[in-house]
């Protein structure tokens, strides 16, 4: 169970990404991951395998979860089998999932915020 009310996602192999940012922080409102303009975390890989809406991140009863949207392919924690559609998995910091050709890691949201602050300081 995650004790914070935010969770971060970082793309591990950002060189395979053609759009979007390398990191994102979800709060208790949750959101969607995909290539569509209406997604909360908008990304696309070089092979354009990421659907308009590919995954749903939710927050319920003190835990964040992830689920595949409709028939989208998500591979969780290096599994060779894709997640069943509509099946929610409780997220833990350090978990890895793959969408298209991109590999993501769930991280502490504070580490993303600290990294952003450090980069801003470097640019000034």
Regions from the PLM with identified roles:
Residues 1-46, 96-97, 101, 110-124:
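Intrinsically disordered, low-complexity acidic Ser/Thr-rich regulatory segments
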Residues 25-100:
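Forkhead-associated
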